[in-house]
Amino acid sequence: MKILLASSEVFPFSKTGGLADMVGALGRALVNAGEEAAIVTPLYRGIQNRFPALRRVDWHFDLPLGAQTVPAELWELARPGEAKIYFIDHPGYFDRAGIYQENHLSYADNGERFIFFSKCVVNLARYLPWRPEVVHLHDWQAALVPALILQQKRAGWGNAPATCLTIHNLAYQGVFPEEAFALTNLPADFYAPDGVGTEYFGMLNCLKGGIVFADSITTVSPRYAREITTEELGCGLDGVLRQNHAKLTGILNGVDYAEWNTTKNPYLFKTYSHARMAGKAVNKAELQRLVGLPVDEKIPLFGTISRLAEQKGVDIQLGALEEMLNTNIQFVQLGSGSPEYEKGYRELAARFPGKVAVQFGYNEALSHRIEAGCDFFLMPSRFEPCGLNQMYSLRYGTIPIVRATGGLDDSVIDFNENPAKANGVKFYEYTSRALAKAIRKSIAIYEHPDLIRHFRKTAMKADFSWNQTVAEYIHVYQKILS
């Protein structure tokens, strides 16, 4: 099978979150499974400098974007054992300091940028000598591709590919003023309301268009697939998703264990495994030293790596830490986002010197060191489509403390569910009090050496490799092709 993945970000070229990790790993997993896979993504600032092997393709296209015609160039990168990467080059849209925003402000032309990207994806799928049988779109930035392909099928594209849309986070839908629809050059009937077009309360909703027009819809965990059809977590699209539930599948993301590996990892201070755990204590001591916390094996170290957004449960985490930092624990945080939440963490660090270390931004090396050096990892999300950090934590023997929602509930086993297979701590109510109770439970686990060893070994044996995940995606592709 020939599969083209389209995503606004792909690791290691561009990344703001788990979307990039998933798409890069899925491309590799498809190649390893014997499929022909390629990925298309924008050429953002700095990629050419970091990857000098990029090659310009003798391919130029001029695409209609409303009343104007916009040019694009194409670059490619081939790497052994990996999906080929195609890069859409338009400096006016993609040569910027950020991918979606600068200084916490979204780019005003994001609708135009990613409508253009979607048109480039369709052009690539139709006219490259390598013709995909399936085009797999990721999130709102590529979600108009199924509608654009259907438009060209109506105009005579006889061997058009089937389409699959993966929703990584339903909260991000790509909603723009009605005038943005003109940029798509789609017929007026594609803007139809009532669940049969791209219209959403008088606005263009890119993700809704993908849900309506894609041949198949997947999301990144079985529980999240159920949750998004409810009014509580459907983000206003639950009705449309219920109408299209027959083509909706939940597939838990896999983990790239070549990247997230405790036995061979350049970022770790010392490697270790579930059979030889001594290296974990070394990583804890070196992490404490690195972030400026007192080096003390007896103090449980809690960590988090997260976008600072309400979805991630930052509000209840700050509330719980206010209480729990009065006990004998340490906390390290990495991430960026809401200025209000950044301020909250700075104030926490000022009030609890020697107990709290905060760093803003993203640092790949530090993220591995936090996963390896912490005893517990906090993920108190309000909702979580899949989540990857809890799976990274499990592989690193760092016990995840999670709210039982979405993929967190699918991947973590609490002691009360199955003592023999317990690998984490769950709580259910979205409150600071419930999270604080889970932290106290974790401290009690830490105080019993045999119990913490059991949790760590069970956690490290959990298997979320891509083998099962990619098989489920291939089944979806085969189903829509048949």
Predicted features and spans:
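Catalytic cores of nucleotide-sugar-dependent glycosyltransferases that transfer UDP/GDP/TDP-activated
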Residues: M1-S482
